[in-house]
From Swiss-Prot:
<dbReference type="GO" id="GO:0043023">
    <property type="term" value="F:ribosomal large subunit binding"/>
</dbReference>
<dbReference type="InterPro" id="IPR043519">
    <property type="entry name" value="NT_sf"/>
</dbReference>
<comment type="similarity">
    <text>Belongs to the Iojap/RsfS family.</text>
</comment>
<dbReference type="GO" id="GO:0009507">
    <property type="term" value="C:chloroplast"/>
</dbReference>
<comment type="function">
    <text>May be a ribosome silencing factor (Potential). Involved in plastid biogenesis. Plastids affected by a mutation in Iojap lose the ability to perform translation and lack plastid ribosomes.</text>
</comment>
<dbReference type="Pfam" id="PF02410">
    <property type="entry name" value="RsfS"/>
</dbReference>
<feature type="transit peptide" description="Chloroplast">
    <location>
        <begin position="1"/>
        <end position="62"/>
    </location>
</feature>
<keyword id="KW-0809">Transit peptide</keyword>
<dbReference type="GO" id="GO:0090071">
    <property type="term" value="P:negative regulation of ribosome biogenesis"/>
</dbReference>
<dbReference type="GO" id="GO:0017148">
    <property type="term" value="P:negative regulation of translation"/>
</dbReference>
<protein>
    <recommendedName>
        <fullName>Protein Iojap, chloroplastic</fullName>
    </recommendedName>
</protein>
<dbReference type="InterPro" id="IPR004394">
    <property type="entry name" value="Iojap/RsfS/C7orf30"/>
</dbReference>
<comment type="subunit">
    <text>Interacts with chloroplast ribosomal protein uL14c (rpl14).</text>
</comment>
<keyword id="KW-0150">Chloroplast</keyword>
<keyword id="KW-0934">Plastid</keyword>
<feature type="region of interest" description="Disordered">
    <location>
        <begin position="1"/>
        <end position="54"/>
    </location>
</feature>
Length: 228
């Protein structure tokens, strides 16, 4: 990740998907495509950091070729028929065994995660990080709710920011980060519902995550983010 010729690594981020998932029936024997969260359609208005409405997350049913399951559905027609039967029986929204999620519980979860994300962003600002962005990405990816993207200017600064964020996560929110333990040109801290991306300037410009996740909702932060 240190240079422009390096491939973007897979960090293996994972957390449980939201309890309510909208399932879109696919065309017969159509191959599943990758997620479309990375393309900008229209600019998003900043979202206040003290308010975040709950939302469902849409996903597409995967064809057998795109699935990692060991279940053998036989021919594609059989898989399509199975999907159609399930949709007729259960409808287009599949819930966990506990039933539909409580909107109040989802809102409380989002509020806690947002408070955590803003606390981490503020800590980065106090250690002189610049161009700090907090993005709500829960509609775009299944494995997290918020991204924090920021720029640092040395490995020592990255290390200080990472250490401060880990302390806040563990002591104030009982969250332990996985990911990079040493500073890199792109350092990642995965707290589950909040994922932090710390870049050196050249890598920040090259990977341009804000553009890739252009449909994410920006969070308005209650402090100066020193945007470039």
């Amino acid at each position: 990740m240190g240079g422009t010729s390096a491939a973007v690594p897979s960090h293996g981020l994972a957390c449980a998907p939201p309890a309510a998932v909208t399932l879109n029936p696919r065309a017969r024997r159509r191959r599943a495509s990758s997620g479309s969260g990375g393309h900008r359609s229209s600019p998003q208005q900043p979202l206040r950091s003290d308010l975040l409405p709950p939302a469902t997350v849409a996903c597409r049913a995967r064809s057998q070729s795109a699935s990692s399951s060991n279940v053998n559905f036989g021919r594609g027609d059989d898989a399509d028929k199975l999907l159609e039967d399930l949709l007729k029986q259960h409808g287009e929204v599949v819930y966990s065994s506990g039933g539909p999620p409580d909107p109040t519980v989802e809102a409380d979860d989002d509020a806690e995660c947002l408070s955590f994300a803003v606390s981490l962003a503020k800590a980065a600002s106090e250690i002189k990080a610049t161009d700090i962005r907090v993005l709500c990405v829960r509609r775009l990816v299944y494995w997290t709710r918020f991204f924090i993207i920021l720029t640092a200017f040395s490995n020592a600064q990255i290390d200080a920011i990472s250490s401060k964020m880990r302390d806040i996560g563990e002591k104030q929110f009982s969250k332990v980060a996985s990911g990079d333990t040493k500073p890199n040109s792109w350092t990642l801290l995965d707290f589950g519902d909040v994922v932090v991306h710390i870049f050196l300037p050249q890598q920040r410009a090259f990977y341009n995550l804000e553009e890739f996740y252009g449909n994410a909702t920006p969070i308005e932060l209650p402090f100066d983010t020193q945007r470039q």
